Amino acid sequence: MFDDLSNYRPANPALWQGRKDTANQERFFQKITFIDNQNELMTKDKKTIFLGFASDTGIKRNLGRTGAKLGPDQIKTQLAKLPCHNNKHYVDLGNVVCENDELELSQSQFAQIVHFCHENGHQICAFGGGHEIAWAHYQGLSSLYPKLGVINFDAHFDLRPYKKGEFGNSGTPFSQIATYCEEKKMPFHYCCIGVQKFGNTPSLFEKAKKLNVSYLSAEDLYEQSQAWQIAFLDDFILNLDHIYLTICLDVLAECYAPGVSAPQALGLSPWQIMPLLKYLIQSGKVVSLDIAELSPPLDSELKTARLAALIIAELLDTN
């Protein structure tokens, strides 16, 4: 399957284990299926596809703390154990792995799989890996969804300087998307939720302003009402047909998410972002989703991994 993609690795069924103390099909490990041939995805039976992007090369290039390459498998391991409260069909399609600093190749191959799955009517729920997953994920969606907006829950804009032909990193994905949109003469629709004042330099705030980025700071989520926040999201998504939703776990406070490259002492709580995430899913406009920056070697008692899995489970159960 995907034999022409050198960095693709098939799913590992051993990751999907859990308690068997209740009726069949009540936990994710009992719901997951695997396929042997990509032609099995060319059917009318639409599925949610789990796809990992096992890379921390972008984090390394960004001078961060590595370990996120192990994130996808750990998220799958934790998700497997959780109860599943819906009747959706899930497929673990495996991972795209970044080897030997070949980030650009890995991103291209990840994008090809995303494109193939969406072209055949499936939805992607992807697990990073560093936030370099965002540029890979977007490339797989852009030609299929012309009026596509990006909503990023993140402490950082990830708009660090990037010029075409340079190597990107975990801090440049949305600069890369902006450059791509400019080249294609497409509007750049980008919204960032949970921005930390001291996680971004003044020049990054200036760049966000120049690119007309919509954003809410972490303070906005503490100080403003949920109704105000939802009105902000409504204004952003009003003229968009589709949304690519990406979650960087460092948007959350270090006490909840210690296992990330750049933990945030003044980050948000899970229940400050969950209502907004669920609202976006309920809008019907989210076509693809990922969660990034889990670094198992930096985690404490699986706190971040378990939280990542719970966030995914909550969103998969939201209609």
UniProtKB/Swiss-Prot annotation:
InterPro entries: HutG (IPR005923), Ureohydrolase (IPR006035), Ureohydrolase_dom_sf (IPR023696). GO terms for molecular function: agmatinase activity; formimidoylglutamase activity; manganese ion binding. Pathway: Amino-acid degradation; L-histidine degradation into L-glutamate; L-glutamate from N-formimidoyl-L-glutamate (hydrolase route): step 1/1. CDD domains: Formimidoylglutamase. Keywords: Histidine metabolism, Hydrolase, Manganese, Metal-binding. The keyword Chaperone does not apply. Pfam families: Arginase. Binds 2 manganese ions per subunit. Its cofactor is Mn(2+). The keyword Hydrolase applies. Mn(2+) 2 binds at D154, H156, C248, D250. NCBIfam families: hutG. Belongs to the arginase family. This is Formimidoylglutamase. It comes from Legionella pneumophila subsp. pneumophila (strain Philadelphia 1 / ATCC 33152 / DSM 7513). The gene is hutG.
